[in-house]
């Protein structure tokens, strides 16, 4: 049987198919996604779960004139394949290839760039209001949002506004009861009751003055198309509740939805994971997870908080053993931080684990609710620095810059697993101020990291290597590349290496000693060069009237796209070879 998918280069070809051909197309699209992701890796389960919905949306609506927004974008692979990127899909998330998320500059079909959760309703509403103002009353605006994302505050803000407008917006709830981890909270239970048919009255969407329909089976393509055609004729804000299964069509992905969200390589035929050679090193997230559990067993005041990332943060270890003291609050970063602040006022010791890129979503809470009140919340910022294939929306390269200007906040970047473990130990002993601890995705550098705890003196850096006429100052785990680069440069004996550890407070005594001894200083960080660690050193040198040459190296003032961490480091000059070349040039 000839493949239908081979002849679809845009939704124009899709709409020429008879409706009874669409189940075959759905199977082909699933197979295509599975076969590519099996070898190239990526987000699997979410895209498999919306194959029928994706086809139906492009079949019924006149995209790209009608505007379609995918919340987060994990589920948009089918959308990309049907909108002219089938032949490029094998480059997904690879350096120079297509993005794993919708991007406006990649395709006219990507109406809004996404990557973070809960933005789709507000964006679609903005577009719908703009169309109203232009007099384009027939244009359709569709936001597809998951049950985990819709529980976020921003999604509710969008719904609240939509309900008092006459804007032509359709909100589709893709309800599969899971985000990356299982959905949580009262809204999740409400949606479960709706699916069971025991929540007929007091519909929360209708109460917001939005036309509600559903729930319907999101894998019954005829039913989905029929309902979309009906809703196309309904004016004003509309809400369609669609029930789907994450991982649909691949048995293992349906049964193990957390693992198969982004499973890595697997056998496309059997679905079995292709296991990687086990690393002798431990992931930083697991160092955090094991350490907080160990500390919590010794200190009854410790609590753990994560906004929807119990697996990714490894807080799940504490949640499994101490569920009453570890909290997954859902996609609710603002709430997570102020919850931690409230706990801190009552003598608890909250470890709030948030990916660096997601802390951006709760900046006011860090300032207003924590730092201003000097509440000793312990922020553990996972995925700091370059994260790799998820690209610009997920790199954690701004935290040093946006946190450094906040009074009363300690900022620490561990060089290795032992340092991470010891700063967590030090923080729970009782700091008088909040602290942000940033560490990267991936594995560490120390096999035997589980050493007895020792305290770290706040605001003190360390010298790792002596040198004659040049000093490299690094912060965090980039010290590994720096150490190797010094060893490989032409005159390693000339180059000293310092791990400053704290961006705030800076070790001013050590900086005075360095600036008095070395004429040339190089700062190296995996944060933006604008306002980060290097900027702090430059400010210190200027305020104290030093005239040394200070070279700042880090993430350039551009958004870094996707690729492996090693590839991206090489592109921006943070790999070992590039740092060695810089040392040779300046030495």
Task: Name every feature range the model reports, one short phrase each.
Residues 110-281, 285-290, 409-518:
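Glycine-rich ThDP/TPP pyrophosphate-binding loop and its adjacent helix/strand module
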Residues 31-38, 99-114, 136-142, 316-330, ...:
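Glycine/charged-rich beta-loop-alpha catalytic/anionic-binding loops adjacent to active sites
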Residues 266-277, 388-390, 410, 535-587:
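Peripheral docking tails and interdomain loops at the edges
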Residues 87-98, 164-178, 371-383:
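A glycine-rich helix N-cap at a beta->alpha junction
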Residues 1-83, 206-207, 215-221, 234, ...:
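N-terminal amphipathic, basic-rich helices that act as targeting or association modules
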Residues 43-165, 284, 302, 307, ...:
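Cofactor-binding active-site loop characterized by glycine-rich and histidine/acidic residues
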Residues 41-50, 70-74, 102-123, 145-149, ...:
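Active-site nucleophile and cofactor-binding loops and adjacent substrate-binding regions
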Residues 67, 250-359, 365-375, 457, ...:
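Non-catalytic terminal/interface segments that mediate subunit docking, oligomerization
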